[in-house]
């Protein structure tokens, strides 16, 4: 039943190694969940703002609903902070994480080295992920992002590679051990399709258009591999709306990143004149679904798939990522960053609305790391880049970006990030949490161990 629509079990064992194979192929009837009653949660929605630290949230709140207002993500009752650090190959702390190690921490419950995707810090071995564990216990699974579906944050759920750059079959230079010739399972895109989540929505069509170079799909594109595995491949809002839950769905809405919502002048040395953001990006094709739309579509598809699958009491695990908060902060583009943070917040609202109508849904909102943004006095003269914005409530807000020299990419920061939750086991996010602890919260909520 768990493999009802043609999974490829021969791949799974090879991907994950023998130890995990024992774990994930244990018959459902023998799980702790079934011995001890239903899991606390039927479904988990994990929403990740990439690079969305407190400064990024506060800037978006100030600009839109005002300093005294509340975003959707501000309304969750239980909240705390998560550490964000990575480790080196010897396990020593590295105080600033990248998104690959950051996502690996909650996806696997283990910290790893920067750049690595759900493989161990020392031996570079695959580590089982939340999505794999949920899938193999009969939950529907999904991942939604505004980056490439093969980018680091979604990849941490569906793939195991030495380096996050190994997105498609043509991108394997940094991952010799993951090539099929090297005994591995191929690129992130190939592994993601083989992992067979029920719903995959985002950008990255370019990575899926690459030709597989080895293995059973040699000579075909990863998109063709997906179709062969039963995926409906959709490219825009209309096709997404027409997708049916009978088969899994792969949505590829852009060649790489899904185009951002807002635009405006970048931060500059010496600052900018007070300005407003342009809330319509002319570079965004009309048929491109926004993150909240994709989230609602994923929730509907996963709800239907969980229902059809008929595993009693088991709903789904869904991760939703607002990816370009980070991307725009790297570019010191305050309007792009604010628009993406607010688009992410609308996805949070969609998740909360779903949870309202579907009891026993745990909603968790957090980030992978802090970013460069600083909210400065309006008359400050920072050494780095800055921009001054006029907020919706008429305030003047100066945002500074000073973690790199002008012309260079802004850096992540090592601060703890907010985590907030509503639903079963939400209280577990209170206080200061280790960045790996979300793995335990989700596995406990869904009864995965
Ligand atoms: Mg990301
Ligand atoms: Zn980043």
Swiss-Prot record:
Chain residues that bind Zn(2+) 1: 326, 330, 412
Cofactor(s) this protein cannot do without: Mg(2+); Zn(2+)
Pathway the protein contributes to: Antibiotic biosynthesis; streptomycin biosynthesis
Cofactor remark from the record: Binds 1 Mg(2+) ion.
Location within or outside the cell: Secreted
Classification via PROSITE patterns: ALKALINE_PHOSPHATASE
Catalytic activity: streptomycin 6-phosphate + H2O = streptomycin + phosphate
Binding, Mg(2+): 50, 151, 153, 321
One function term, GO molecular function aspect: alkaline phosphatase activity
Entry protein name: Streptomycin-6-phosphate phosphatase
Organism (species): Streptomyces griseus
């Amino acid at each position: 039943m768990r493999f009802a629509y043609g999974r490829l079990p021969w791949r799974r064992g090879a991907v994950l190694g023998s130890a995990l194979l024992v774990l994930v192929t244990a018959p459902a009837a023998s799980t702790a969940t079934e011995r001890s009653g239903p899991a606390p949660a039927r479904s988990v929605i994990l929403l990740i703002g990439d690079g969305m630290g407190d400064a990024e949230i506060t800037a978006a709140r100030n600009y839109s609903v005002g300093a005294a207002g509340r975003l959707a993500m501000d309304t969750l009752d239980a909240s705390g902070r998560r550490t964000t650090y990575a480790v080196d190959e010897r396990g020593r702390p590295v105080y600033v994480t990248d998104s690959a190690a950051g996502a690996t921490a909650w996806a696997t419950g283990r910290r790893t080295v920067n750049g690595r995707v759900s493989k161990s810090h020392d031996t570079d071995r695959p580590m089982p992920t939340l999505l794999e564990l949920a899938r193999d216990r009969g939950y529907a699974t999904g991942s939604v992002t505004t980056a490439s579906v093969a980018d680091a944050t979604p990849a941490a759920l569906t793939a195991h590679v030495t380096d996050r750059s190994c997105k498609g079959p043509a991108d394997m230079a940094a991952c010799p051990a993951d090539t099929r010739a090297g005994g591995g399972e191929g690129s992130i895109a190939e592994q993601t399709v083989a992992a067979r989540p029920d719903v995959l929505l985002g950008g990255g069509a370019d990575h899926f258009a690459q030709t597989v170079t080895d293995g059973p799909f040699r000579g075909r594109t990863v998109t063709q591999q997906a179709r062969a595995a039963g995926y409906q491949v959709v490219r825009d809002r209309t096709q997404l709306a027409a997708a049916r839950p009978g088969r899994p769905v792969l949505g590829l809405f852009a060649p790489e990143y899904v185009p951002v919502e807002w635009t405006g002048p970048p931060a500059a040395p010496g600052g900018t004149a007070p300005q407003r953001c342009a809330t319509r990006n002319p570079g965004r094709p009309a048929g491109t679904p926004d993150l909240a739309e994709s989230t609602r579509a994923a929730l509907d598809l996963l709800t239907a798939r969980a229902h059809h699958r008929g595993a009693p009491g088991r709903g789904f695990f869904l991760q939703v990522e607002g990816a370009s908060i980070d991307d725009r902060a790297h570019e010191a583009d305050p309007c792009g960053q604010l628009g993406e943070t607010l688009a992410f917040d609308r996805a949070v609202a969609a998740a909360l609305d779903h949870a309202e109508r579907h009891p026993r849904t745990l909603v968790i909102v957090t980030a992978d790391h802090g970013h460069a943004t600083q909210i400065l006095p309006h008359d400050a003269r920072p050494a780095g880049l800055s921009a001054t914005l006029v907020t919706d409530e008429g305030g003047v807000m100066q945002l500074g970006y000073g973690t790199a020299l002008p012309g260079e990419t802004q850096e992540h920061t090592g601060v703890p990030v907010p985590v907030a939750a509503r639903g079963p086991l939400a209280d577990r996010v209170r206080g200061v949490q280790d960045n790996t602890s979300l793995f335990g919260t989700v596995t406990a909520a869904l009864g995965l161990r």
